[in-house]
């Protein structure tokens, strides 16, 4: 860790980035809030509350559990750093369960706001972010979502920051995975909400563009848009099986694939799909909502189905960083598993808010909002280096391709490759290349 003393009221603490003192002072001065002649800057003292809206229950609960551990780890680090510097304030994290439900998320945001909290990590799903957005904007509540990706929420000047690229980036990743596996007729199954609709659209457009660019014949078929509240999928699986059967009869199973866009309800969907042999004869591609879902590796029959259909789920890849390993270790020790990459974004979200608060030296969401993009630009944390675009979303990124696989007599998630956004190419892991020969 490198700590740079702050001139006047500014400090820039860059995790793991070794820079000279002179450079540090220059950077701090660049984004220091102005203090007029004779003015006395207000100072932070005592408890500084930060809220977190996490899906500790519902269809993103495994992610929520991971991110809670990551946030608690960040809270501990931040407070140790503040104490070592002799600061008179400390971070206090207030976690509420959003239940992966938009209405619950709004209710819990209002609860946190009622306690005077003006800074929030989460919620995770785009449907939740969409629901809370108006209230957050109206009340100057700064929200940092670690995983909301809907392009519909990329709005310049609002109070929502997202430390992940939108699905205008993820869509091409999923399209490339399906295309490179030989799929030319892609049937979509998706969660009918803000996130699912946006990702389905982005993937469809990217896949059709690939077909056009390469001169290949093919199509994207609107398969099943399901209710996000659904718990059982026998009817949806039957409809999907009928569509796939017709396409396989026309074009052959090697050219037909399924684009499955959902959260943990995909466990139940795949369980229903197993009743139709044709659905295990074509390739599947998932999304960031299924990457790392623990329920898909707990049951052997579900894991084997995923292996057979090569169920690769793209999820935004963290950059190389030694701090990633610290967070991963903390989650592994507490929960016995590796976290999804969004846990690293949660960790970085709390750190960057804390750094911005330290710079403005007051509990002022507007002051933090004004400098947060510059803090992020000079920050190097668990998810690596990144910048925010004009809408406050992560501006770029590659995607890891996660898949359930056989590990040590059981099953776990492994990374089969990385999709590189700049070149629209996939770098496959050697183990995966050998496994699918």
Language-model features and meaning:
Residues 2-437:
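Extracytosolic ligand-binding ectodomains
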């Amino acid at each position: 860790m490198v700590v740079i003393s702050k001139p006047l009221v500014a400090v820039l603490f860059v995790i793991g980035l070794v820079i000279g003192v002179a450079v540090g002072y220059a950077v701090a001065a660049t984004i220091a809030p102005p203090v007029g002649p004779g003015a006395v800057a207000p100072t932070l003292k005592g408890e500084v509350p930060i809220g977190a809206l996490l899906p500790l229950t519902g269809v993103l609960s495994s992610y929520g559990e991971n991110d809670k551990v990551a946030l608690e780890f960040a809270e501990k680090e931040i407070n140790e750093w503040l104490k070592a510097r002799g600061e008179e304030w400390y971070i206090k994290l207030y976690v509420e369960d959003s239940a992966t439900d938009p209405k619950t998320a709004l209710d819990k945001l209002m609860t946190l706001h009622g306690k005077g909290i003006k800074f929030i990590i989460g919620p995770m799903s785009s449907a939740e972010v969409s629901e809370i957005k108006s209230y957050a904007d109206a009340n100057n509540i700064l929200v940092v979502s670690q995983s909301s990706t809907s392009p519909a929420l990329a709005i310049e000047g609002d109070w929502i920051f997202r430390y992940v690229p939108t699905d205008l980036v993820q869509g091409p990743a999923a399209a490339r995975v399906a295309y490179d596996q030989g799929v030319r007729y892609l049937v979509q199954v998706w969660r009918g909400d803000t996130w699912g609709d946006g990702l389905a659209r982005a993937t469809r457009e990217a896949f059709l563009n690939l077909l056009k660019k390469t001169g290949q014949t093919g199509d994207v078929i609107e398969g099943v848009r399901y209710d996000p509240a659904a718990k059982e999928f026998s009817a949806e699986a039957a409809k999907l099986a009928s569509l796939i059967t017709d396409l396989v009869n026309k074009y052959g199973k090697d050219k037909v694939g399924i684009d499955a866009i959902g959260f943990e309800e995909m466990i139940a969907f795949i369980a229903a799909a197993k009743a139709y042999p044709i659905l295990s004869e074509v390739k599947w591609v998932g999304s960031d909502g299924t990457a790392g879902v623990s329920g898909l590796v707990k049951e052997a029959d579900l894991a084997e189905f995923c292996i057979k259909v090569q169920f690769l789920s793209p999820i935004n890849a963290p950059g190389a960083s030694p701090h990633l390993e610290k967070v991963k270790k903390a989650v592994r020790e507490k929960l016995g598993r590796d976290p999804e990459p969004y846990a690293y974004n949660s960790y970085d979200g709390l750190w960057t808010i804390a750094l911005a608060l330290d710079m403005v030296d007051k509990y002022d969401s507007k002051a933090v909002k004004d400098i947060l993009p510059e803090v992020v630009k000079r920050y190097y944390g668990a998810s690596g280096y990144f910048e925010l675009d004009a809408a406050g979303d992560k501006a770029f990124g590659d995607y890891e391709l996660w898949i359930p696989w056989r590990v040590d007599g059981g099953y776990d998630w492994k990374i089969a490759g990385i999709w590189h956004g700049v070149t629209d190419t996939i770098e496959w892991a050697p183990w995966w290349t050998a496994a699918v020969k």
